[in-house]
A protein has these predicted regions:
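Short secondary-structure boundary/capping segments within folded domains
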Residues: 15, 41, 233-237
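Structural detector for internal amphipathic alpha-helices that build alpha-solenoid repeat scaffolds
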Residues: 22-24, 46-62, 77, 84-99, ...
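Short, contiguous, helix-prone interaction/anchoring segments in small proteins
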Residues: 36-45
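Fe-S-dependent hydro-lyases/dehydratases of central metabolism
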Residues: 95-96, 102, 109-110, 117-307
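Amphipathic alpha-helical scaffolding segments comprising HEAT/armadillo-like alpha-solenoid repeats
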Residues: 28-36, 59-78, 99-111, 130-142
Length: 307
């Protein structure tokens, strides 16, 4: 029941906060509950409902993303009314969903008679790369004279999705989390914890859960075999600089993506509008295993190997 959702969700938030991790992303059923509450928001809960639909619903082609995109599309087109989300705001939120179920609605909104709505749809498409065959739908509108579609095509041609991003700084001040010896992916993403890999924040708690030779006392696992040195890593982050993960040999083994997810959970930055996923971070090693290196790069990190 939608009426019971918020209390259940708050209980879930409390349970996860005890572990020091954020709540899970919304499921399709939870997203539907949020939407029902948005249609008639309980007094005092307006802010949390906006937070949930904006930041806690998955992007892409997740089932929950389909529910979210369908509702936002209806609001943006004006077939659904929402006191908390205007048509322009709905179009803007569609543009944060990266690709998947949001693409068709945004392309349709390029024809909207309200300029502010069409402008928001165009802005979202300019920063969306996962278009696949629907690129041709935008091109077709541009060829027929749609000015918003033309602006999207020109933006893609100019690679504004890339050039609009901050430049790589000349220098970066880092705090080092140094781990001696060879670090394999099982140190970062233990096989016995494979069941939790889809839940990145929870799985990351197992990183370095087993002690290593020559390990400093403060970097020992908080609970051997269960929980890694989370407080120690947090103390490094509290210094105010990016934390660089540093090792002698880093990333040997087979679980490259889940291992990367764990490292980036502690050293990276939140991906805007995408719950429980991070990008960025710095990884330094005398030697970084090639596939782990590539996976770090693909995840938006900066791996540097000096051999």
């Amino acid at each position: 029941m939608a009426s019971d959702f918020l209390q259940t969700y708050r209980n879930h938030v409390g349970e996860r906060s005890v572990l020091g991790i954020p709540p899970l992303p919304l499921s399709a059923a939870q997203t539907a509950d949020v939407i029902e509450l948005l249609k008639n928001p309980p007094k005092g809960d307006e802010a949390i409902l906006l937070e949930l639909i904006t930041h806690r619903g998955p992007a892409g082609v997740d089932n929950a993303a389909k529910v979210k995109a369908s509702y936002l599309a209806a609001v943006a087109h004006g077939t659904e009314k929402c006191a908390l989300i205007s048509r322009e705001h709905a179009a803007q939120l569609l543009g944060t969903m990266l690709g998947g179920y949001n693409i068709s609605p945004m392309i349709a909104l390029l024809d909207d008679l309200e300029p502010s709505v069409a402008t928001q749809a165009a802005a979202g498409l300019k920063n969306t790369l996962l278009m696949f065959d629907q690129f041709h739908d935008v091109k077709e509108k541009a060829d027929k004279g749609n000015s918003y579609a033309k602006s999207v095509m020109q933006s893609w041609a100019n690679a504004e999705w890339f050039t609009s991003r901050p430049e790589v700084p000349e220098s970066i001040m880092l705090t080092v989390f140094k781990v001696a010896g060879e670090i394999n992916t099982d140190d970062l993403s233990p096989a016995p914890d494979a069941w939790s890999r889809p839940d990145i924040p929870l799985h990351a708690l197992a990183m370095h859960k087993n002690p290593r030779p020559d390990q400093s006392v403060e970097s020992l696992p908080e609970e051997e075999g269960k929980r890694g040195p989370i407080k120690f890593i947090d103390s490094l982050k509290a210094k105010g600089h990016l934390v660089a993960y540093v090792g002698d040999v880093v990333g040997t083994g087979s679980s490259r993506k889940s291992a990367t997810n764990s490292v980036l959970w502690f050293t990276g930055q939140d991906i805007p509008f995408v719950p429980n996923k991070r990008f960025g971070g710095v990884c330094l090693g005398t030697k970084i295993a090639p596939i782990f290196y590539n996976t770090m790069e693909d995840s938006g990190a900066l791996p540097i190997s000096w051999t």
